[in-house]
A protein has these predicted regions:
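ABC ATPase nucleotide-binding domain "signature" loop
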Residues: 11-13, 44
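Conserved mid-core alpha-helix of short-chain dehydrogenase/reductase
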Residues: 20
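ABC transporter nucleotide-binding domain
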Residues: 23-108
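Short, charged/small-residue-rich alpha-helical element at the C-terminal edge
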Residues: 76-146
Length: 151
């Protein structure tokens, strides 16, 4: 068929079958098939969808081309992997903590300049992060912002 509907296509699949199904999905997309997918796994949506609609309680909260949506947010996130506690220093530079993990930190930044100043201070204090990446927010983060804003 030219049009395929998938409802939570990866739900309940183990990693091996997930990879098998991803291969099938890629083949279908490569063959020019149109796929309408409902999913709560935003990483899957990012991987396979060009256009999207995010619904909350039956109402559209975001729709459009995925690249354009993400581009409209800009590079507002900072990922830092570091073995040192850098949170107080980050907060003193106006960075807002989104998440602390075993491997590092995720911050929201107002500008590249604030991230640059933060990095300069880290280096001046002889703190050298393994990773320092300014990036656009993930679709998962955008979903949380949009759906959380309408609840």
């Amino acid at each position: 068929p030219e049009l395929i509907f998938l409802d939570e296509p990866f739900s309940g699949l183990d990693p091996i079958n997930t990879d098998v199904f991803k291969g099938v999905l890629s083949e279908l997309i490569g063959a020019g098939k149109y796929i309408v997918m409902s999913s709560h796994q935003m990483s899957t949506v990012e991987e396979y969808c060009r256009d999207l609609v995010i619904l909350n309680r039956g109402k559209t909260v975001l729709q459009g081309n995925l690249r354009q949506i993400k581009a409209s947010y800009g590079h507002t996130n900072l990922s830092v992997s570091c073995g040192t506690d850098i949170l107080p220093l980050a907060e003193s530079h106006g960075l807002r903590l989104l998440e602390k993990t075993a491997g590092g930190y995720e911050f929201k930044i107002d500008s590249d300049a604030s991230a640059q100043a933060f990095l300069e201070e880290l280096v001046a204090r002889r703190i050298f992060p393994e990773r320092f990446e300014i990036r656009e927010p993930s679709l998962h983060e955008i979903f949380i912002e949009k759906v959380g804003a309408t609840d």
